[in-house]
């Protein structure tokens, strides 16, 4: 298993560019197609903590129609509620997310 993990959507140009950049630099990475194998709530919490974000919105597609349809723009929602929404609707996960040793 690689020390680098990238949460990847092959249909996303930015995600494809990130994978290409890693390959060009000879960096082996485990590509997780998160729409096919979505992270569960526990893994999302781990990702959130590793990213060091103040708000889970930093790892969400906040401009996506689904985000607004689900009322996730409500400022009263806490990080747990937002992470549960990503677990239930993995398309809300902003990509790419690259995790590994610094």
Swiss-Prot record:
The keyword Protein biosynthesis does not apply. The record marks 8, 61, 95 as: Important for activity. Gene3D superfamilies: Glutaredoxin (3.40.30.10). The active site is at 12 (nucleophile). InterPro entries: Arsenate_reductase (IPR006659), Arsenate_reductase-like (IPR006660), Thioredoxin-like_sf (IPR036249). The keyword Oxidoreductase applies. CDD domains: ArsC_ArsC. It catalyses: [glutaredoxin]-dithiol + arsenate + glutathione + H(+) = glutathionyl-S-S-[glutaredoxin] + arsenite + H2O. Its EC number is 1.20.4.1. Involved in resistance to arsenate. Catalyzes the reduction of arsenate [As(V)] to arsenite [As(III)]. This is Putative arsenate reductase.
